[in-house]
Amino acid sequence: MSTFDQNSLLLLSSILVPLMVGAFLLFGAFLNKATRCWISALGFGYPLVVAVLLACFFEANPGAYNYELCLPTGLQSIGIYLHLGLNAVSMPLFLLAGIVGFSAGVYAIFSQVDRSHVYLALLLFMLSGLLGTFASVDIFFFYFFHEFALIPTFIMIGIWGGSNRRIVALQMTIYLTLGAMLSLLGLIALYISSGAQSFSLLELRSYLVANPLSQTVQNNVFGLLLFGFGILVSLFPFHSWAPKGYASAPTGAAMLHAGVLKKFGLYGLLQLGWPLLPLGAIHWFPWIIWLALANILIIGLITIAQRDVKLMLGYSSVMHMGYAFLGIATFSVVGAGGVLLLLLAHGLSVALLFMLSTCIYQRTLTLNMQHMGGLATQAPILGAFFIAATMASIGLPGFGNFWGEFTIFVALAESAPTRWVVLPAAIGIIISAIYGLRASANIFFGQPRGGFTERLQSGLIR
C-alpha cells in the first residue's frame, strides 16, 4: 500500500526508538548515572531530530498524507493496519511532541528523583505514545497510542506526585477513563455505521463522502466524540481533573500532558469529527459555543482566585482550551488554522511554565504566590523566562498564542452565527491579563513577604 522510503522509515523509527530506549532503561538499574543520562538523551533527542527533518521536507497538500507507511498487524481481516503518515493537521502536533518531549526529557535527566531509570522510561513510553497518536492514519492505532501514552501519566503521578497524589491519580483515572470510553464508543459507532472495510482514516473519508451518514447517526456519533474528546481536553464542566492533576504531577509528566497529550481531543475533532460528521457538528454547534465560553469565563474567574502557581497554570491551561473549541465551532479553514496555531503555541508556553514553576519552588520552597516577592533580584534570568512565557500564555501581541487567538477571533467575526461570540470571548483576554500580570508581580517584584524574607536573607534561594 505504501513504499518504504527513507522518510517513512524515519517516521516509524521516531516512535520505536523512545519505546526501545524506555524498555532498556526500565531494567537498567545496573547502569551508572552517566550511561543512563546518555542513553536517555538518545531516546528523547532522536524523535526531535526526526520531527524537525520531516517538518522541513513536508509538502502540504489538502487531504493528502506525507511519509505514508502501511504494515500488516495480523488483524488485516478486520481492516486494521499499522498505517502511519502526517498531514497538515498532524505535522505541527507531531513537531510539538518532539520539542516538548525533548525539553521534558532533558529536565528529567538532570532532576533528582528516586528510581530515575523507571521515571525516565515512563517518560519515554509517554513520548512514544504521543508520537504514534499524531502519526497514525488508522483510527484503531490513533486510539491505542493515546491510551498507551496515558498509562505512564497515572503511574508517574501515583509514584512521584505531590502529597495528595493517590486521590489525584484516582480522580484523573475516573475522568479520563470515562472520556476514553466515550470516544472509543464514538469511533466504533463511526466505523460500524459507515460500513467501511478498513479503519484507515483515508478510506473512511472516501467512503463517507460517497455514502454520507444520516442526520440522526451523525448527531449521535458526533455527540459521543464531542463529550469523549471534550473530557480528555477538560471541556467544562468535565475540567476538575486537570488543574489538580498538573499541580500534583512530576514536572516531566505535567509538561508532556498539558503541553501535548491534552491536545489529543481537539486533534480528534479536527481530524475526525468535523470532516467526517459535518451534519452532526452543526447539530452540536450551540453546545460547543456555550461550553467553550464557560471554559473561558467561568474557569478564567477561578484562575484569578488561585494563589498556588501550579494550580493557576492548570486552570489557565483549561481556560485557553475554550478558545480552541470556539475555533472548531467556526467550521472554517481559517478557524481550523487558528486552532492549530494556538495548540502549538500553547503547548510550548505551558510546558515551559510548568518547568519554570518547579524551578521557582526549588528556590523558594513554596508555590504560594502570597508568600513570595522580589525574586527577580535573586534570579533575574528565571524571572525573564517566566515573565516571557506568561506573556505568551496570556496572548500578548507578538507571541504565537496571540496569533492563534487572533485568527480564531477573525474566523468568529467572519461568520454570522458566531459573530456575537467575539465580545464575551474577548473578556477572557482581560481575565488572562489580570492573573498573568498579578502572578509575575507577586513572584518577582515588590518586597519579599513572610518566611520568604528569612530564606532570602539566609541565602537558601539560589
Task: List each language-model region with its residue ranges.
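Predominantly late transmembrane helices and immediately cytosolic-facing juxtamembrane segments
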Residues: 236, 350-356, 420-456
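Structural signature of hydrophobic alpha-helical transmembrane segments
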Residues: 6-17, 86-97, 139-152, 218-231, ...
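Helix-coil boundary and interhelical linker segments in multi-pass alpha-helical membrane proteins
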Residues: 2-5, 131-137, 270-284, 324-342, ...
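Juxtamembrane/interfacial segments at transmembrane-helix boundaries in multi-pass membrane proteins
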Residues: 59-81, 180-239, 269-287, 335, ...
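Alpha-helical multi-pass transmembrane bundles of energy-transducing inner-membrane proteins
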Residues: 31-33, 118-213, 217, 302-369
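Central hydrophobic cores of alpha-helical transmembrane segments in multi-pass inner-membrane proteins
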Residues: 12-27, 41-54, 94-109, 126-127, ...
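Transmembrane helix-loop-helix hairpins at membrane boundaries of multipass inner-membrane proteins
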Residues: 1-10, 24-121, 197-198, 202-206
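C-terminal ends of transmembrane helices
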Residues: 22-32, 101-113, 155-164, 233-247, ...
